[in-house]
Amino acid sequence: NTRSGETPKFNDPMLNKQWHYKNTGDETLVSPIKEGCDINVEPAWEFCTGDPSIIVAVMDEGVMYKHEDLAANMWVNQAELNGQKGVDDDGNGYVDDVYGYNFAKDQGDITWTDPEDSGHGTHVAGTISAVNNNGIGVCGIAGGSGNNDGVKIMSIQIFAGRYQSTISRNVDAIYYATSMGASILQCSWGLMSGAINSDEQYLDERSIEANAFAHFINTKRPGSPLNGGIIIFAAGNEAGACGYPAAYPSVVCVTSLSTDFTPSVFTNYGMPADIAAPGGDLYYHKNHSDAGQVLSTVLKLDGMYAYMSGTSMSCPHVSGVAALGLSYAKQLGKTFEPDEFRDMVLASVNDLDPYLTGVKKHNNGTMNLVEYKGKMGSGMIDAYKMLMAVRGTPAITVEQDKPTTISLSKYYGDVTALSCTLEVSDAVKDKLGLTFTVEGNNATIT
């Protein structure tokens, strides 16, 4: 694993406040904080920054498609953009669906100006694909390099102020996203913890939704490097069991981390959790500092950029890394099956268990961190490891100055007939003092 130098790759002025991308442990930004508690995206950007053929459907409030830092990376239905107002120009059953569709109001116009709109969907979208290297605002994980090469955001609006789509409309939304080419369904929404307590109850009460998920996951899209789709959900914010649909096995359930590898005060957790990502932690940091939250795009009334926290904010980090992974796969000419790609996402992590000891004190009480061990998912998402997995080169983090044993089967599967070659120049080997031995399924570096 590598970490980049001090010079930012892009010129976006707020990138240095996005600790969730690169955390230097700067206590003048926020405290407590630990270096390295981030998604390690800067070294990943050396290989790939996005691809406009990759579409992420943001199922949420409407995305402000006119936002200065999002407009260039919005998905556009060209047939409707260049067609006649009030006419279903592309014959897909939806009129004027230029940037997606408003399923909350059953109309083509995406909205964000209802009195109760919060900018939630716009914030989520910015984490995934705010335009990079454009000299303004923030960066998106797969927002490109400033050359119209970021992944595209499709707005699948299911909330509009006091309006909310029904389950049947949610199902329509998922089928729409599938048919219009989205490979990733980003879902920072769900039922409260405890509203549904088992997969059986979920299927009994919301089987049409589960069937729509299966359709999204298993339907091939022409030209996509993923022979299907991946669905990514926020675990929820009640500090309890993961809510549904996030807890349903076919989707990816994302928990939230603070700035120091500890679980966010609010995050849901438990065995259904699949993976963790930065989501911020307002009530953990001194003086309730906003800087310990996630910085992204918001509505114009809120100043275009703002901090938010929640599993709603951790979830798009995983969607963004998945989008970056698919972009790199497209660049390399590789294709993956849905289960294969999901496994790669969940394996592209850094271990959290070493940080889950003792207690965490916050403004509202104390957390016993041991209770979270093994219940936050496979680990903290790492963008660099994701791209190395796509390339076929597993990235493994080891500690300096101590022997490290690596289980090859964890990274390569059945290793009974594996031929392992280590290529290190004599100069590097001598400088680092490396030795490398293989015994059975284990490789040992000293």
Predicted segments — roles?
Residues I110, P115, V138, T166-N170, ...:
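Active-site-adjacent substrate-recognition loops and nearby beta-strands
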Residues A44, M59-K66, A79-N92, D114-S118, ...:
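Flexible, small-residue-rich helix->loop connector segments that border functional cores
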